[in-house]
């Protein structure tokens, strides 16, 4: 029993180390872009997400529709990083070859604008959704185009939110993973 506890503790430390390394990689990936705080139009951000989806989905061989519901509001943040966040969510969703619908919507939530990215093709529990933001060896062993590492999209998104917390001066920016309400 003592050996088992020791082995489990060692395994936990090992995975914490991996998580730290991957978070550092995500952070370094974002360091290449200087954080530029500005006022961003939500409809403009959504238009770019639609354009990116069309480009990323071209030739995939699955019937996936992408609908958006923007609101005429503005957010404070880094335009390039927010665009990159949406592109990462789209890339991850399109890595699953299923027909169906993906929705992107925005809504006012107190002082914040809530962005809702919903993949209607998949059903996951809250726990399964939250696990997407942690390292998963199986997801990461799959390589994408040009040999790029896959399965880190959500880690990058998490790091973008952390950067916005730090640099935009608005604490409380979060990614909440929750099942869609039908």
Language-model segment annotations:
Residues 8-18:
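Short alpha-helical segment of the dimerization/phosphotransfer core of two-component systems
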Residues 30-40, 76:
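Short flexible loop/turn segments at helix-to-beta-strand junctions
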Residues 36-51:
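A conserved beta-strand-to-alpha-helix junction within the catalytic ATP-binding
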Residues 38, 63-73:
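Conserved catalytic submotifs in the C-terminal HATPase_c
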Residues 87-92:
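Conserved polar catalytic motif of the HATPase_c/GHKL fold
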Residues 101-111:
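Short beta-strand/loop element within the Bergerat-fold HATPase_c
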Residues 124-141:
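Short conserved segment of the HATPase_c
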Residues 156-172:
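Conserved glycine-/histidine-rich ATP-lid loop and adjacent helix of the Bergerat-fold HATPase_c
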